[in-house]
Amino acid sequence: MKRSLPLLLFAFCATSAWCQTIRIVNNNPGATGGVNVYTGATALQNAINASVSGDILHVIPGTVSNGNVTITDKSLTILGVGLDPQKGLGTRSLVGDINLVGPASSGFRASGIHFLRLLPNISCSSTWTISNILIENCQFNAVQMLSSACAIGNMIVRNCVINSHQGFSSGPQAFEIFVNSGVLITNNIIRCQSNNAGVVKGDGLTITNNLFYGGGTFGVFTDTDNSIVRNNIFSRTSPALNTTTCTGNTFQNNIVFGSSDNSFTDGIAGNTSTGHIIADPLLTNVPSTTSDWVYTYDITLLAGSPAINAGLDGTNMGPTGGILPFDEEGTLLPLIEAINMPAIVTKGVDLEVNIKAKGN
């Protein structure tokens, strides 16, 4: 069903201060361009180039990726149709690598898109920090820093499906984060599929209420230091640490099952583990696999699961616990089809904007 959604934006641009622009990105064949509507193979990059900090880029779903993009010293939001959209859309908002360059790229947010990698500080010519990054309701392969000269500050990755491809070091990894001042990885589903490199590499991370799944023989952590690992489920993948490269980590209330090494490292190299459980978490349907996540799988805990209300905070271990439990559909956004507004905007006068959108 299509609806016309009239929005009255009160005191729109009433001062000379910065104003937010919504830009529509549609690379589907035959898409029609217009004011703040970008089409063609480079639609997303063109929209980024035209944007200023604070702008929102709405990526229309399609079958062809919008390709790799670079955001240089702009604080932008990229929104897609949702993590696993319903209503028979059958397509996703697809993007390649997202490269963030420069400290003014702080405040970047991505929600509801399927992308390859987030590469913060991909071109780090001097010491800077990109901060306040939010990745939510997305599917992606990895978050990776290419340089230890720069840093990430206050990044949150939540309610995502992470398939752990395209590592730069010894194998495919989900996270390679060298220098940070606050990275929270919470309520995600994370694939483990390499026996020579864990999927998490970093220092000072907080890792809570995730599901790490695999095929029974692989481990999660490599060169992970001074991190908090709490309320996670390790299904057919090992949380055991290599104490030569992993030091000073605190594990609290995690559960492991079905791995070749169902153990938690405690009392070695400054690593500690308390409240851990070695038992089947009784997930409804998560098979033994190293393949990418399939959305027909079901992470719901069955009755009698030892992970129910067993987290340090009294909620479930794994993605169904914590403050914001995992929602496989993510936050579904309406599919914006057209935005109509006057060609001339008078300062200090209310502006009426008509948005035509299709429900999701």
Regions found by a protein language model. Name each.
Residues N26-S65:
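Acidic Gly/Asp/Thr-rich repetitive segments characteristic of extracellular carbohydrate-active
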